[in-house]
Regions:
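Conserved substrate/cofactor phosphate-moiety recognition/catalytic segment
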Residues: 51, 58-70
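Short, well-ordered coil/turn elements that cap or connect secondary structure elements
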Residues: 47-49, 67, 85, 118
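Pre-Walker A (Motif I) flank of P-loop NTPase domains
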Residues: 15-21
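Post-Walker A helix-loop "phosphate-sensing" segment adjacent to the P-loop in P-loop NTPases
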Residues: 40-52
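Pre-Walker A adenine-sensing motif
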Residues: 1-15, 36
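Short secondary-structure boundary/capping segments within folded domains
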Residues: 13-14, 43-46, 80-82
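Conserved P-loop NTPase motor cores
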Residues: 7, 21-41, 57-61, 73-135
């Protein structure tokens, strides 16, 4: 179990796993860059993530390639891939939630409410609208 006490020199950017993080802000305000920096801070620690899943709105997106993701998705994947064995990070980057199907919305809600707390998953989500984000 991770804690703020060990190691004593823990950086504020090395958030205790598992966690949920929501980054809200307009276009070009540094949301994705902040999420990448938090991920990289974990990777430089003694307990890095073993898996990284990126969920984004474009299959052509290359901005996360330098983080060597395990998989890149354009839809919320089946939640069975999160088996709880490996320390996992999911980054949902500027994913459009208003046009999601009911099944996709259900998967996202289950991921945020259950998977992040019971399956060894930390989830970071960036979104551009303060008013339309997932509850």
């Amino acid at each position: 179990m991770e804690s703020w006490e060990k190691p004593k020199n823990r950086s504020p950017g090395h958030i205790i796993h598992p966690f949920k993080l929501l980054a809200l802000g307009g276009t070009g305000k540094g949301k994705s860059n902040s999420l990448k920096n938090i991920f990289l801070k974990h990777q430089s620690s003694s307990k890095p993530f073993q898996k990284l899943y990126i969920i984004t709105c474009s299959e052509e997106s290359t901005e996360w390639d330098d983080c060597e993701p395990t998989e890149l998705y354009v839809d919320i994947p089946d939640l069975e891939i999160f088996d709880g064995e490996d320390k996992t990070c999911v980054i949902i980057d500027d994913f459009e939630t208003m046009k999601m199907s009911k099944d996709q919305y259900r998967k996202l809600a289950t991921m945020m409410r259950y998977v992040c707390t019971h399956r060894n998953v930390s989830c970071m989500l960036s979104y551009q609208s303060f008013f339309d984000c997932v509850p």
